[in-house]
From Swiss-Prot:
This is Putative cytochrome c biosynthesis ccmC-like mitochondrial protein. It comes from the Eukaryota. NCBIfam families: ccmC. The chain crosses the membrane at residues 21-41, 60-80, 96-116, 119-139, 144-164, 192-212. The gene is CCMC.
């Protein structure tokens, strides 16, 4: 017996109200982050003003990994239960995750250009993130043919997540090591707060996209069934 939220009718009744609440949180956090990152956070002594792109680059990178883990969990649950909502969540996650990964690659290129002299290098971290982007696209492609195959493909793709995370430690890369870890941070608090605010904003934005996209898929399926 599934929890009520996994029933499409219950989801359609409650989800729009939740989306409105998330939109409010998203606007508030974004406004706070913009103010703190532009007018409060100081310039970096090495990169000057160019470093400010980290306020969107780093949270987007976190989201690209977090969404993939959530997508993999949803895929495992689909393989175990065959519940259609888990398949919808995985499909929606692949779309949103691909966008965040592409955004990470683009902003990373603009951040790296002043430091490396080029928008792209075949660095271990950059290459593994590019592979993540292609895995997202592959998951979307497989979803069109078989949900089971797509779910298995997504689970196999989990191998790439620790590679992305630890690539700067395992190999000699141009990408700087992580400035934030469980043991502390090398970033000043005035720079750290906007990063977490943007991350929270991206998190709520992802929730909004999940709700709206899943609602659209459910409605499309409903009208398709009704027309038959």
């Amino acid at each position: 017996m599934y929890v009520p939220l996994l029933r499409p009718f219950f989801f359609m009744c409650c989800s729009f109200r939740y989306a409105q609440i998330l939109i409010g949180f998203c606007w508030f956090l974004t406004a706070m982050a913009i103010y703190l990152s532009i007018w409060v956070a100081p310039s970096d002594f090495q990169q000057g003003e160019n470093y400010r792109i980290i306020y969107v680059h780093v949270p987007a990178a976190w989201m690209s990994l977090l969404i993939y883990i959530a997508m993999a969990i949803s895929s495992v649950l689909f393989l175990l239960t065959k519940h259609p909502l888990f398949q919808l969540f995985s499909k929606t996650a692949a779309k949103i995750g691909a966008l965040f990964t592409l955004f990470t690659l683009v902003t990373g290129g603009f951040w790296g250009k002043p430091m490396w002299g080029t928008f792209w290098v075949w660095d271990a971290r950059l290459t593994s993130v590019l592979i993540l982007f292609f895995i997202y696209l592959g998951a979307l492609r497989f979803q069109e043919f078989s949900a089971d195959v797509a779910s298995i493909f997504i689970c196999i793709g989990l191998i790439n997540i620790p590679i992305i995370k630890f690539s700067v430690n395992w190999w000699n890369t141009l990408h700087q090591p992580s400035s934030i870890s469980q043991f502390g941070t090398s970033i000043h608090i005035s720079m750290l707060i906007p990063i977490f605010l943007i991350f929270a904003s991206f998190f709520f934005l992802t929730g909004i996209f999940f709700i709206l996209e899943t609602r659209q898929i459910i409605l499309s399926f409903y009208f398709q069934r009704k027309s038959q």
